[in-house]
């Protein structure tokens, strides 16, 4: 192992089975950057952040400038390059950069917090999870940049990763060469309730659009809702799926091919094993990354508490029509129904009452000169277009491309076309 810093352990470059060159970084960073003195589960004041640096083969790896990819979520690790991972978008980036894939703190190989009793009690684990937001993720990135001896680097943020990019611009714009954001501009200056009012309206419209395309599915969804209301709808694993959790199938509509995937699911017999198996794997939240549900609302909290905002802010029209679908709207009862989330409920309750600090400084954002480009998806049901454009207008060097061609996952689904468009836009090669 070679060391660029006493706190950094870096491997040598090696070839991977995908034909890429890869090296691994492990960096020790402070857990608590807020000064409250919180400690890691092992009693230390530090955690480890892992990053995988990737370069195209056949070149000197350091010959291309560095770009950090910040993953969506929150609570999800960076993607792992593999032959069947659908990472054609990564290939497009590697034509111009070497890419650093960071597992954000608490995920993947970065001191993962993967059990509700990780810190010994719900209260202690909740305290631990308060340190997994964009503010401290950005400071981890800064520590890694410094440890690698880099003066500047570029960023690409997808969804929540774009929130991290915005925080980075707010705090350390001088460290950034160029920034790219895909479906991920936060709602600076807006409350979480305002955000959910917009996303619920987007999901109402998306639901109606879906039923216009597949009219029979409204009756199918109504029947499933009746079964769910009687406690008769279950996954193959035996979890009871209530009416509200059933609605979360609407999250499928936020990605490429999601409408067809939902339609194919609803065509199946609700009593069949295949339906119940696919249902369990299609529901939003839970599963492999419980953090996605547990800390989800915190990513929208630019100060204040969240207090189960998605549950509080839901419009009356959703109460009247059980066939209207929801998206990234976490409801408390979903924790009670999902065996994977149930142990996290006490932690989630504590986080819902936590007083979150502000994340963004509009004055500093307005003073930045970093060039960049953002893809704003007109049909995005997860990140509202109106607040996205308001935030983009605060950042002088950020050019926006508004498109209805892609859903929220356009960066991945386009196979690199979105990134190439943003690169040309940021460089001034195209105007929009």
Locate the predicted segments by residue:
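Short beta-strand/loop motif that positions the catalytic acidic residue
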Residues: 368, 373-376
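Core-facing hydrophobic residues within beta-strands of well-ordered domains
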Residues: 176, 395-398
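Short alpha-helix in the alpha/beta-hydrolase fold that links the catalytic acid
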Residues: 265-267, 384-393
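Short glycine-centered, acidic/aromatic-flanked micro-motifs in structured strand/loop junctions
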Residues: 29, 376-377
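Conserved alpha/beta-hydrolase "acid-adjacent" motif
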Residues: 258-261, 381-387
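Gly/Pro-rich cap/lid or specificity-loop segments adjacent to the active site
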Residues: 4-8, 12-236, 359, 363-364, ...
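Alpha/beta-hydrolase fold active-site neighborhood
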Residues: 231-357
């Amino acid at each position: 192992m070679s060391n660029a810093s006493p706190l950094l352990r870096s491997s040598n470059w090696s070839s991977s089975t995908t034909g890429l060159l890869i090296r691994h970084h492990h960096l020790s960073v402070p857990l608590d950057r807020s000064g409250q003195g919180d400690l890691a589960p092992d009693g230390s004041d530090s955690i480890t952040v892992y990053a995988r640096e990737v370069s195209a083969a056949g070149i000197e790896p350091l010959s291309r400038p560095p770009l950090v990819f910040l993953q969506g979520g929150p609570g999800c690790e960076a993607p792992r390059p593999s032959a069947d991972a659908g990472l054609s978008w990564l290939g497009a980036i590697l034509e111009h950069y070497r890419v650093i894939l960071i597992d954000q703190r608490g995920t993947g190989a970065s001191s993962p917090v993967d059990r509700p009793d990780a810190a010994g009690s719900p209260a202690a684990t909740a305290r631990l999870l308060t340190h997994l937001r964009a503010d401290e993720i950005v400071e981890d990135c800064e520590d890694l940049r410094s440890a690698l001896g880099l003066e500047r680097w570029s960023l690409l943020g997808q969804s929540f990763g774009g929130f991290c990019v915005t925080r980075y611009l707010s705090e350390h714009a001088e460290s950034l060469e160029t920034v790219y954001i895909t479906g991920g501009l936060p709602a600076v200056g807006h409350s979480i309730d305002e955000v959910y009012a917009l996303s619920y309206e987007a999901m109402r419209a998306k639901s109606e659009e879906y039923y216009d395309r597949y009219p029979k599915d409204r009756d199918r969804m109504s029947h499933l809702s009746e079964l769910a209301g009687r406690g008769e709808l279950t996954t193959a694993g035996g979890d009871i799926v209530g009416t509200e959790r059933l609605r979360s199938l609407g999250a499928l509509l936020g990605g490429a091919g999601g409408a067809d995937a939902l339609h194919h699911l609803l065509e199946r017999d609700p009593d069949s094993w295949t339906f119940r198996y696919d249902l369990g794997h299609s529901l939003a939240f839970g599963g492999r990354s419980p953090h996605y549900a547990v800390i989800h609302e915190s990513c929208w909290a630019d100060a204040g508490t969240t207090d189960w905002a998605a549950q509080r802010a839901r419009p009356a029209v959703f109460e009247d029509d059980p066939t209207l679908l929801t998206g990234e709207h976490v409801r408390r009862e979903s924790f009670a129904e999902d065996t994977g989330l149930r142990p996290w409920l006490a932690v989630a309750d504590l986080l819902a009452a936590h007083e979150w600090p502000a994340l963004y400084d509009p004055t500093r954002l307005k003073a930045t000169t970093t060039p960049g480009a953002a893809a704003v998806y007109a049909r995005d049901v997860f990140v509202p277009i109106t607040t996205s454009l308001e935030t983009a207008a605060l950042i002088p060097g950020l050019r926006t491309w508004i498109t209805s061609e892609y859903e929220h996952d356009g960066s991945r689904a386009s196979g690199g076309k979105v990134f190439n468009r943003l690169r040309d836009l940021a460089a001034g090669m195209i105007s929009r």
